[in-house]
């Protein structure tokens, strides 16, 4: 559990920064232990008025913070590094302050090369669903991060949804599946709504049906995954584990029925190949945007 005394500085009050701020407050974090750095005056006023949080400069926000979350766009990271380095220089022990980056493509080695030696760095990739507390954040830790520090960061992001950990080498793949993933689902909903209108539904009804169907299907899948995890704990070593999505699809598909007819058309249209190509393209683009150490 994240210490109630740990001060958290959020650098950047955009959508992800606000999602983390609101999530931490919902989880019971005291507003006095949170501070935000935001350069846009209108945005700063909005955050201060909405959450009663202190909004200040980067240098002031970082001072005395145990965790510094860099939630700016990748193109803005370089501009805040000077302030972060300056603040770290006056700190008593840089190893006590953990820097967490949620900026896409900004690598741990890049940040370690800019900050004082031994600074703990964690890379995080949340997705857009964090805005409603239902996201998933994937974390990768740097070489100077202690076990307790990493547990604290896990607890921090648990306030905005699920949390997974991977080696940093997999973060581009994570970006392609999860970071960009919500847009894939929105596009699928768009297509499903348009198809619903084409067969006689109103757009409002089709949208409600599509959205609720997506939400319910996701809930079914998550429940099955929990059941499978429990089964795996008692299963013999090496036992085959089925893909839960495939299990559920088979369960609700009656031979010769309407669902089978629809799935046949999706397979004939190359849905799997298109999804694979999309994820590959996103991964390649993430690699191209990567910011590494000089």
From Swiss-Prot:
Gene3D superfamilies: NAD(P)-binding Rossmann-like Domain, ProC C-terminal domain-like. SUPFAM superfamilies: 6-phosphogluconate dehydrogenase C-terminal domain-like, NAD(P)-binding Rossmann-fold domains. One of its GO terms (cellular component) is cytoplasm. InterPro entries: 6-PGluconate_DH-like_C_sf, NAD(P)-bd_dom_sf, P5C_Rdtase_cat_N, P5CR-like_CS, P5CR_dimer, Pyrroline-COOH_reductase. Keywords: Amino-acid biosynthesis, Cytoplasm, NADP, Oxidoreductase, Proline biosynthesis. PROSITE patterns: P5CR (PS00521). It catalyses: L-proline + NADP(+) = (S)-1-pyrroline-5-carboxylate + NADPH + 2 H(+); L-proline + NAD(+) = (S)-1-pyrroline-5-carboxylate + NADH + 2 H(+). PANTHER family: PYRROLINE-5-CARBOXYLATE REDUCTASE, PYRROLINE-5-CARBOXYLATE REDUCTASE 3. Catalyzes the reduction of 1-pyrroline-5-carboxylate (PCA) to L-proline. Belongs to the pyrroline-5-carboxylate reductase family. This is Pyrroline-5-carboxylate reductase. It comes from Mycobacterium leprae (strain TN). The gene is proC.
């Amino acid at each position: 559990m994240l210490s109630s005394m740990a001060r958290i500085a959020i650098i950047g009050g955009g959508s992800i920064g606000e999602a983390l701020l609101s999530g931490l407050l919902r989880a019971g974090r005291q507003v006095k232990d949170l501070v935000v750095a935001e350069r846009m005056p209108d945005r700063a006023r909005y955050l201060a008025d909405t959450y009663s949080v202190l909004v200040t400069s980067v240098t002031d926000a970082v001072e005395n913070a145990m965790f510094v979350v860099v939630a700016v766009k990748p193109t803005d990271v370089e501009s805040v590094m000077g302030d972060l380095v300056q603040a770290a220089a006056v700190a008593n022990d840089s190893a006590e302050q953990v820097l967490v980056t949620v900026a896409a493509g900004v690598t741990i080695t890049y940040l370690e090369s800019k900050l004082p030696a031994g600074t703990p760095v964690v890379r995080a990739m949340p997705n857009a669903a964090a805005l409603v507390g239902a996201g998933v954040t994937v974390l990768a830790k740097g070489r100077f991060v202690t076990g307790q520090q990493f547990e604290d960061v896990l607890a921090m992001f648990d306030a905005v949804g699920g949390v997974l950990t991977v080696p940093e080498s997999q973060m581009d793949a994570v970006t392609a599946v999860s970071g960009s993933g919500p847009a894939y689902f929105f596009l699928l909903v768009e297509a499903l709504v348009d198809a619903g209108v084409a067969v006689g539904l109103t757009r409002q009804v089709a949208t409600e049906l599509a959205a609720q169907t997506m939400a319910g299907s996701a809930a079914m899948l998550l429940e099955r995954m929990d059941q499978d995890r429990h089964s795996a704990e008692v299963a013999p070593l090496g036992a085959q584990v089925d893909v839960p999505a495939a299990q559920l699809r088979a369960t609700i598909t009656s031979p010769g029925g309407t669902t089978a007819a629809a799935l046949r058309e999706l397979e004939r249209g190359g849905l799997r190949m298109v999804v694979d190509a999309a994820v590959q393209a996103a991964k390649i683009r993430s690699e191209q945007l990567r910011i590494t150490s000089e």
